Amino acid sequence: MSITPERKQEMIKDYATKEGDTGSPEVQVAILTERITNLTEHFKIHKKDNHSRRGLLMMVSQRRRLLDYLKGKNVKRYEDLIGRLGIRK
């Protein structure tokens, strides 16, 4: 259900804008998307896990805020990111 440290480092390397970049919106959104995907799979089995569902909703909200921020700062980076992650149509 959680992301392994190796997977997290791989995602940081893939989405970082420069060396050592772990806090850029792109990296944060990519990690949140992975966590959201994992939790979505969890809920297919555990439908009544409302405690974790609240955490999922908080993650989705955080990702939305980060995407809104990125869209306001740099639309090109926003469009590239959603294209790479496949989270918008």
Swiss-Prot record:
InterPro entries: Ribosomal_uS15 (IPR000589), Ribosomal_uS15_bac-type (IPR005290), uS15_NS1_RNA-bd_sf (IPR009068). It holds the Pfam family Ribosomal_S15. GO terms for molecular function: rRNA binding; structural constituent of ribosome. It comes from Rhodospirillum rubrum (strain ATCC 11170 / ATH 1.1.1 / DSM 467 / LMG 4362 / NCIMB 8255 / S1). This is Small ribosomal subunit protein uS15. The keyword Glycoprotein does not apply. Residues 1-21 have a biased composition (Basic and acidic residues). One of the primary rRNA binding proteins, it binds directly to 16S rRNA where it helps nucleate assembly of the platform of the 30S subunit by binding and bridging several RNA helices of the 16S rRNA. One of its GO terms (biological process) is translation. Belongs to the universal ribosomal protein uS15 family. CDD domains: Ribosomal_S15p_S13e. One of its GO terms (cellular component) is cytosolic small ribosomal subunit. Residues 1-23 are annotated as: Disordered. Part of the 30S ribosomal subunit. Forms a bridge to the 50S subunit in the 70S ribosome, contacting the 23S rRNA. Keywords: Ribonucleoprotein, Ribosomal protein, RNA-binding, rRNA-binding.
